[in-house]
Regions:
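Extended C-terminal subregions enriched in glycine
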Residues: 517-520, 552, 561-609
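Compositionally biased, proline/threonine/alanine/serine-rich low-complexity intrinsically disordered stretches
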Residues: 27-98, 647-654
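Short beta-strand scaffold segments in enzyme catalytic cores
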Residues: 153, 158-165, 459-463, 526-528, ...
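Bacterial N-terminal signal peptides
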Residues: 11-23
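Noncatalytic scaffold domains of N-terminal-nucleophile
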Residues: 82-122, 126, 134-135, 139-300, ...
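Internal maturation/activation junctions in enzymes
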Residues: 372-476, 485, 607-608
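Bacterial N-terminal signal peptides that target proteins for export
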Residues: 2-13
Length: 654
């Protein structure tokens, strides 16, 4: 998919703001509402009334909690999967068995981590081994990912998180999406009235929003953490100080062939002592990042949202080219808040996703459309199954691009998008052959179409602790290495390029237009699946820009409708269908299947976007667990052999 706007001459339209005095950081320490796990009636999401300010955070206590010794057994690693059976001429083959051979490690022990880098997985397992809870391990995983996979996520980015409480069977959501500065202007990505080049916008100071991942994790930890906040950064601080070997993937994105060639700042941060850019296998130490993590450990999120680091972020975003408007007041005012997830039935299970500005509602709509077809009776080698998948995807994107945005600023018609009568109407538009791109449904909202381009600098991970609590978290700096600007050893996001560059389309306002204080719409949609008894079934998610929704939907269809094993579901080919574009992994589809799609009007082309990076954990009905990591990236799924139960929650555990 081409993600470039036409390039036009730069005109300076934003002047640098004077730095404002900091106000006390008050990242949300809100109590979560009674979260839902079943499928309640969904109200339309509308801009709420002004909410009272969240109470201020105090610095974390420094008294360490007593921790049991970690288990001494080495964790087991998930092996790679083999190919699916080839399609047979004339008729699709029988559905593969649920698990014809061991495709992923399976265990009755509940402590698991699946993430995009083995060192991040080990960091999470280390915390679980000390008796930590799932949320504790999530903090450690994110801290390590910011070191070993900095091109995808980190301290300077944002995230969405779902949390499953095994004691209550409930699912909660928390929004750590980046926020536009108060002075952000609707036209800030326009030049002479036209959208500027996408790369030009990405590498500008205007692209950076207030990062939310750390504020979100601290808010979540205050409610559902077990160990002290300070302990959770120890693995990443140790690795940043002592060094780690650069992975092939990190080295690839530092190379000249990267879709976003490294900026001068990125090259300076990720270079050897001789000045050459890091190569695969080089030992990389990041002492500045270690200092940042130590400050976060000692001071909590104040270390990021106030003081020296906050001032450095503001200074970095006010540099040419195209300086932005981020202020210390914007940073100090960041809030993360608990909310109820959106949960809907699919194939006898309940699928839960975050509410807007996540695009989880679009994923639920696509699944609902597919349930109006016979896709569940088909197999993954049947061209008709993939045709139905593609058409449902196109319908989903048409509605998503028009209606989904930050509900604090525009009404999002969640209930209407998921209404059974509306779903039936949308599904009826799927004919025998692919035609022109479908139009969005008429929901009595005068909105323009959103043409936002979404990059793929993102990561997803899943944690299950010894008590069965679960974290499913998608985290991002947006594009590869975010804005290309760095401070204190980490990368700043370019999340504001997830807004539509033009505030109107055809004279109608665009829901996802830029506005000060607004959070851009996101395709990130971490998933937790539960059964009718509110028991945990699966947690999964993926990076991949706007294709995240299709990567997730493919995996859910394969797992819940086609009854494939977890690893088979993750490794199925990816197919992307949005508007006029049909792309996919041609080498993973059989010639017979591709021919069948051509007969139905779909000519797949090789995709230009970054591939999926699915990570998932599944609980079987016999109580055993299975983890899977997408072979398209460097991730692993590993379990921790018998561990002590998580430490009991102490008052003020932050």
């Amino acid at each position: 998919m081409d993600c470039m706007h036409n390039r036009y001459t730069v005109s300076a339209i934003v002047s640098a703001l004077a730095l404002l005095c900091s106000t006390p950081y008050a990242a949300a320490a809100q109590e979560p509402p009674a979260p839902v796990a079943a499928a309640p009636s969904t109200p339309e999401v509308s801009p709420p009334q002004a909410a009272p300010a969240n109470p201020p955070l105090s610095a974390p206590e420094t008294t360490p909690a007593a921790t049991p010794a970690p288990a001494g057994e080495p964790p087991a690693e998930t092996p790679a999967a083999g190919p699916l059976p080839e399609a047979q001429p004339g008729a699709p083959p029988p559905l593969p068995a649920v698990a014809p051979r061991r495709l992923a490690t399976r265990s009755s022990h509940q402590a698991w981590v699946a993430a995009a880098n083995p060192l991040a997985v080990e960091a999470g397992l280390e915390i679980l081994g000390k008796g930590g809870k799932a949320l504790d391990a999530a903090v450690a995983v994110q801290a390590m990912l910011g070191l070993v996979e900095p091109q995808s996520s980190g301290v300077g980015g944002g995230a969405f998180l779902l949390y499953y409480d095994a004691g209550t069977g409930k699912v909660s959501a928390i929004d750590g999406r980046e926020t536009a500065p108060a002075a952000a202007a609707p036209e800030m990505f326009l030049e002479h009235g036209r959208p500027m080049s996408f790369v030009e916008a990405v590498r500008s100071g205007r692209s950076t929003g207030v990062p939310g991942a750390i504020g979100m994790l601290y808010t979540a930890h205050a409610k559902v953490g077990g160990l002290r906040w300070k302990e959770l950064f120890e693995p990443a601080i140790r690795a940043a100080s002592q060094g780690f070997k650069v992975s092939a993937r990190l080295a690839m994105f530092l190379g000249e062939g990267s879709p976003f060639p490294p900026t001068t700042e990125i090259r300076a941060l990720f270079s050897r002592q001789d000045g050459e850019i890091l190569q695969e296998g080089d030992l990389f130490q990041n002492p500045e990042y270690a200092k940042t993590l130590q400050r976060l450990a000692d001071e909590g999120p104040r270390a990021l949202y106030q003081g020296t680091i906050a001032s450095q972020m503001v200074t970095a975003t006010h540099q040419e080219p195209l300086p932005g408007t981020l202020s210390v007041k914007d940073l100090a005012g960041y809030r993360a808040a608990w909310s109820e997830p959106l949960c809907r039935p699919f194939q006898g299970f309940t699928v839960c996703v975050p509410p807007p500005p996540s695009s989880g509602v679009a994923l639920l709509q696509m699944l609902a459309i597919l349930e109006r077809t016979d896709i569940a009776k088909r197999t993954p080698n049947d061209p008709q199954a993939w045709y139905l998948f593609a058409q449902a995807s196109r319908l989903m994107y048409a509605d998503r691009d028009r209606y989904v945005a930050d509900p604090r600023f525009v009404p999002v018609p969640v209930a209407k998008l998921l209404d059974p009568a509306y779903i039936k109407l949308r599904a009826s538009l799927i004919g025998p052959r692919a035609g022109a791109p479908p139009q969005p449904g008429s929901l009595a909202l005068n909105r323009g179409r959103d043409a936002t381009n979404e990059s793929a600098g993102t990561s997803h991970f899943v944690v299950v602790d010894a008590e069965g609590d679960v974290v499913s978290m998608t985290t991002t700096v947006e594009s590869i290495f975010g804005s290309g600007r760095t401070v204190a050893g980490f990368v700043l996001n370019n999340q504001l390029t997830d807004f539509n560059f033009e505030p109107t389309e055809g004279g109608r306002p665009v829901a996802n237009a830029v506005h000060g204080g607004k959070r851009p719409r996101s395709s990130m949609a971490p998933i937790i699946v539960i059964d009718k008894g509110n028991n945990f079934v699966a947690a999964l998610g993926s990076p991949g820009g706007s294709a995240i929704l299709e990567y997730n939907a493919k995996t859910l269809v394969a797992l819940l409708a086609w009854k494939l094993s977890l690893k088979q579901a993750v490794e199925l080919p990816n197919l992307i269908a949005r508007g006029e574009t049909f792309s996919g992994e041609l080498g993973r589809f059989s010639p017979a299947l591709l021919a069948g799609l051509r007969e139905r009007g779909i000519e797949l082309k090789t995709g230009h976007a970054e591939n999926s990076g699915l990570h998932a954990i599944l609980r079987h009905t016999d109580g055993t667990y299975e983890g899977a990591a997408d072979s398209r990236r460097e991730g692993v799924a590993r379990m921790l052999p018998p561990v002590q139960k998580p430490a009991k929650r102490a008052v003020g555990a932050n």
